[in-house]
Amino acid sequence: MIKAGTISEVPVTNLDFFPTLLDVAGIVLDPGKVLDGKSLVPVLTGKGVIAERPLFWHFPVYLEGGNMETQDSIFRTRPGSSVRLGDWKLIQYFENNDLELYNLREDIGEKVNRFRSDPAKTTELLAILEKWRRETNAPVPVALNPSFAKP
């Protein structure tokens, strides 16, 4: 068991919850069934690790109006995808192909966009993101929604 107060820096996603619950319950999936997440049991028990892997988020739709009180006033109004690998996170917006690159260890608040100052990391993560979208057949909008404009 992990000691109280232990902090883990292992990046996880909600896709890891189901494989974790299956693992805890001792349920083995049929061969050929694939889950996107990984069991967190090795991390939770302190008896193993989860290999570093890219984590993906894909939001191909227009959803809600802007909130001027937030850091990103048009968050969830524009379609895009993002990938996190290690300390790095890349966001790509589909409307204008804007890219944002953040080093989360140095900038957890995502204030300093480093896509211009770190082109090699931008290229690396963009290639990973584009490959994932192709492999998963992720939908990408091809037309702008004129009802959603930057405030």
Task: Show which residues each predicted segment covers.
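Short, charged, surface-exposed hinge/linker loops at domain edges
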Residues: P141-P151
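C-terminal structured subdomain/cap of oxidoreductase catalytic cores
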Residues: L104, P119-T122
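Short amphipathic alpha-helical coiled-coil/interface segments
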Residues: L125-L129, R133
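Bilobed periplasmic-binding protein-like "clamshell/Venus-flytrap" ligand-binding domains
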Residues: W132-A143
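Intrinsically disordered, low-complexity polar regions and short flexible loop motifs
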Residues: D107
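Active-site-proximal N-terminal segment of extracellular/periplasmic enzymes that hydrolyze or transfer
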Residues: V112-A120
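C-terminal cap/loop subdomain of S1 sulfatases and analogous C-terminal strand-loop tails that border
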Residues: M1-A4, V10, L15-F18, L22-E100, ...
